[in-house]
Regions:
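Accessory "access/gating" subregions that flank catalytic or transport cores
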Residues: 156-159, 163-166, 171-177, 191-198, ...
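Short glycine/proline-enriched loop/turn "hinge" motifs that connect secondary-structure elements
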Residues: 79-86, 123-125, 180-184, 233, ...
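Short, conserved phosphate-binding/catalytic loop or strand-edge motifs used
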Residues: 130-134, 183-191
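A generic structural motif
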Residues: 18-20, 95-101, 155, 195-201, ...
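ATP/Mg2+-dependent ligation/transfer catalytic cores
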Residues: 1-179, 372-433
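Active-site-proximal beta-alpha loop/turn segments in soluble metabolic enzymes
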Residues: 143-153, 186-201, 230-235, 247-252
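Acidic, glycine-rich loop-and-beta core segments that form the ion-binding/anion-interacting portion
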Residues: 201-270
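Catalytic-core signal marking the mid-to-C-terminal active-site face
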Residues: 221-222, 246-433
Length: 433
């Protein structure tokens, strides 16, 4: 796509990913979108929590007057939105007052890592799979459908109108959805996106989530990517498939039918950095309610061949299909930051020529060779704060700002939690005390 998509529109939706992976947007005229002066967005966007609590940071505060950022459209992402009359959408890169790419912006973080990969002669390709729950609008939040079976033909009757509309919309904006199917649990679904270069894959993931939410709203539904949306409900994760390519060939493939030596170095780098950057895969308090043993959710920095109990599942497959599946992230993940963390970790392994341990051959959780990962947001924040390698992987300024954002999230949670009296406490102590 190009400027033609914008020139044919009356209104342009300028989209920017925030720290939590949501798309913030501004509607402008086509003339404004194409103007060399561009549109602006206040730096406070990176001083907002997911619920829009405001906090100050060195990047945006009363000390510097909360300056503007320049929104520069990435015309490769310009798309007409057929479901919105005379409207196009385009993702934007953000530039600071100094004229440089804004280092805190998730798109900038990923671009920097992807450029590093390109300098080594590789193209990184990623594909995301998202699990989610769809419920009917209303205070009762009744899940879509009456049955809870995975891969259910029966449930497809209930799902089909939403799935078909989703396929149509994604095709219209150039997002290649490979599949949609039911998952275990009432209202639980999964969709998979085809692989693409790292930055494009993140764009696809962020847009697919946002546009699916919009579609569900039009149909009287709500789509939630909350990892555990209510007590007793199944959980939602996000799995990323990844590989490196050079001159049209998959660098993860070995002629002996297994993973190449380079793939094992890349894998080793992800394993040794996983604990440090775990908060980027699981960025919320709720994310850790998903990470329980025995639920196919990885709790160790582990790997195995076609092993779904491990954090990284190696799939040798074929010359075109050899890849690694990273299974740690929750569905609330920011795809830009997760892909940046995975790719940076893998490149670290290649640069240091790290060796991966032998794979887990059974339950990776029970394999004592693999270190445990954070089980709370507080532990994950501490791991990033104490990391010696993360600033080099993702940039000091970004790491410091992201730490601040998660510390704010923790503080707000602890303040709320301190005021709560649980049902368990009430049942146990009300009459006996």
């Amino acid at each position: 796509m190009s400027e033609n998509a914008i020139e044919g529109a009356r209104v342009v939706q300028l989209e920017v990913p925030d720290l939590d992976g949501g798309l913030r947007a501004k509607l402008v005229s086509a003339a404004k979108a194409l103007s060399p002066a561009g549109a602006a967005m206040c730096t406070i966007m990176f001083g907002l929590t997911q619920a829009d609590d405001v906090y100050e940071s060195p990047a945006s505060s009363s000390d510097n007057g909360f300056p503007d950022l320049l929104m520069r459209p990435d015309m490769a992402t310009a798309r007409p939105l057929p479901w919105c009359e005379d409207t196009a959408a385009v993702l934007c890169d953000l530039y600071g007052p100094d004229g440089a790419l804004y280092p805190v912006a998730p798109r900038t973080v990923l671009r920097t890592v992807a450029d590093r990969c390109a300098e080594l002669g590789f193209e990184a390709r990623f594909a995301a799979e998202f699990e989610l729950c769809v419920v009917h609008q209303g205070d009762d939040a009744v899940p879509l459908g009456r049955t809870m079976n995975a891969y259910s033909l029966l449930r497809l009757r209930e799902l089909r109108p939403l799935a078909q509309a989703f396929f149509e919309r994604m095709e219209a904006v150039g997002i290649p959805i490979e599949s949609v199917h039911t998952e275990l649990g009432h209202g639980m679904l999964e969709f998979a996106i085809s692989h693409a270069p790292a930055g494009e894959a993140a764009d696809h993931a962020a847009r697919a989530k946002a546009y699916l939410k919009e579609l569900c709203g039009e149909m009287g539904l709500v789509a939630t990517f909350m990892p555990k949306w209510r007590s007793g409900a199944p959980t939602s994760g996000c799995h990323f498939h990844q590989s490196l390519w050079r001159d049209g060939d998959n660098a993860f493939w070995s002629d002996d039918g297994g993973l190449s030596a380079l793939a094992r170095q890349y894998l080793a780098g992800q394993l040794v950095t996983m604990a440090d950057v775990s908060v980027l895969f699981n960025p919320s308090v709720n994310a850790y309610r998903r990470l329980q043993p025995g639920t196919w959710t990885p709790v160790t920095a582990s790997w195995g061949v076609d092993n779904r109990t491990a954090a990284i599942r190696a799939i040798a497959g074929s010359p075109k299909g050899a890849r690694l599946e990273h299974r740690r992230a929750g569905a609330d993940v920011n795809p830009y930051l997760a892909i940046a963390a995975m790719l940076a970790g893998g490149l670290h392994g290649i640069a240091e020529k790290l060796e991966a341990p032998d794979p887990a051959t059974g339950d990776a959780v029970a394999d004592g060779r693999f270190p445990r990962l954070a089980t709370t947001l507080a532990d994950a924040v501490d791991a990033l704060r104490g990391s010696e390698v993360a600033p080099g992987l993702l940039g000091r300024e970004f790491v410091d700002h992201y730490l601040l954002s998660r510390e704010v999230e923790l503080r707000l949670w602890r303040e709320w939690e301190a005021e709560q009296v649980t049902e368990w406490e009430h049942r146990r102590y009300f009459e006996t005390s």
